[in-house]
Swiss-Prot record:
PANTHER family: RIBOSOME-BINDING FACTOR A, CHLOROPLASTIC-RELATED (PTHR33515:SF1). It comes from Streptococcus agalactiae. Gene3D superfamilies: 3.30.300.20. This is Ribosome-binding factor A. Keywords: Cytoplasm, Ribosome biogenesis.
Length: 116
């Protein structure tokens, strides 16, 4: 049962953070950021927030990370307004590499088809 609650809280935080980034954070560094997943610690004290950015430039990725870290206070404050939780978890933003990894595998498979 506790695991189900952790998953629900993670999904709610994912939805809310996407909404907050879209409507409340006016930082151009995070305009193209999309939250892909949220993993919660068992005691709900920490949320690892995975994100992607629509740019492949390393400088844009770094700027997005800095922008998210700067906006953490605003995001937590807005989460506190929108969620009915005793304590809002600490947020750790991590770039989601799974989409890039999947794209790389797709490209390798396409190259295999071309060679045959």
């Amino acid at each position: 049962m506790a695991n189900h609650r952790i998953d629900r809280v993670g999904m709610e935080i994912k939805r809310e953070v996407n909404e907050i980034l879209r409507l409340r954070v006016n930082d151009p560094r995070v305009q193209d950021v999309t939250i892909t997943d949220v993993q919660m610690l068992g005691d709900l004290s920490m949320a690892k927030v995975f994100y992607t950015i629509h740019s492949t430039l390393a400088s844009d990725n770094q700027k997005a990370q800095i922008g998210l870290e700067k906006a953490t206070g605003t995001i937590k404050r807005e989460l506190g307004k929108n969620l009915t939780m005793y304590k809002i978890p600490d947020l750790q933003f991590v770039k989601d590499e799974s989409i890039e990894y999947g794209n790389k595998i797709d490209e390798m498979l396409r190259n295999l088809d071309k060679k045959d």
